[in-house]
Amino acid sequence: MVMSSYMVNSKYVDPKFPPCEEYLQGGYLGEQGADYYGGGAQGADFQPPGLYPRPDFGEQPFGGSGPGPGSALPARGHGQEPGGPGGHYAAPGEPCPAPPAPPPAPLPGARACSQSDPKQPPPGTALKQPAVVYPWMKKVHVNSVNPNYTGGEPKRSRTAYTRQQVLELEKEFHFNRYLTRRRRIEIAHTLCLSERQIKIWFQNRRMKWKKDHKLPNTKGRSSSSSSSSSCSSSVAPSQHLQPMAKDHHTDLTTL
């Protein structure tokens, strides 16, 4: 019973694997597939072609114009075709590709023109644009305001006197508030200072001394004395005229 059921079931073919005839009738296989699955078209000594057939350079001479009438093209395998994006593979019958042509040489006239043009910058260097200078970046000089100004001494910094220099100057001021030219030169050489520095120090020291002793300024005192003398001179003639008028009146009465 078990054997008969096995024989009955063995007659049925699994629908998942239809026979080759159905594939051939439905057009699922191409000519190559029909040859593979048919098995009767080739002989027993037939060998399937490889993926990358090895060309035989001995049969075809180098530099031929094309394949001969008796030569057959190699069969293509399932790999990448020659000349595809992966690289160029020359077929046995195809000639080797020629090397690329060199670039044309420049004409001598054009080369001479390019060398004679100094304004044209070299190709590797970039053009340098001039820097933008704004008005607030420009420094105002005195020469631009007054063209006749030839320039003078710059603004002097404040002199820092040492303690020894101040002590010697105070001693000299205690004895002489005004210096002569000769004495000023001697003190300048002794204290390693300039005559101008000695002169300015004595001027400032005299102003301080007058302020401490509450003395009037010399310039203000001279102006006040001149004004008082002018007032006294204007009053004096009027005082002389009054006695003269009285004497003249007495003379008239006596007559």
From Swiss-Prot:
A single BP term in Gene Ontology: stem cell differentiation
Skewed-composition ranges (Low complexity): 222-234
DNA-binding region: 154-213
Biased composition regions of type Basic and acidic residues, renumbered to the chain: 245-255
SMART domains from the UniProt entry: HOX
Principal subcellular localisation of the protein: nucleus
Motif Antp-type hexapeptide in this chain: 133-138
Location of the region described as Disordered in the Swiss-Prot/TrEMBL record: 31-128, 212-255
Localization annotation: Nucleus
Pfam family, one: Homeodomain
Record keyword Nucleus present: yes
Keyword entries, A-Z: Developmental protein, DNA-binding, Homeobox, Nucleus, Transcription, Transcription regulation
GO molecular function annotations of the record: DNA-binding transcription activator activity, RNA polymerase II-specific; DNA-binding transcription factor activity, RNA polymerase II-specific; RNA polymerase II cis-regulatory region sequence-specific DNA binding
CC terms in the record's Gene Ontology section: cell junction; nucleoplasm
PROSITE patterns tied to this protein: ANTENNAPEDIA (PS00032), HOMEOBOX_1 (PS00027), HOMEOBOX_2 (PS50071)
Record-stated family: Belongs to the Antp homeobox family. Deformed subfamily.
Protein's job: Sequence-specific transcription factor which is part of a developmental regulatory system that provides cells with specific positional identities on the anterior-posterior axis.
The protein's assembly and partners: Forms a DNA-binding heterodimer with transcription factor PBX1.
Protein name: Homeobox protein Hox-D4
Species the sequence originates in: Pan troglodytes (Chimpanzee)
Lineage, opening ranks: Eukaryota, Metazoa, Chordata, Craniata, Vertebrata
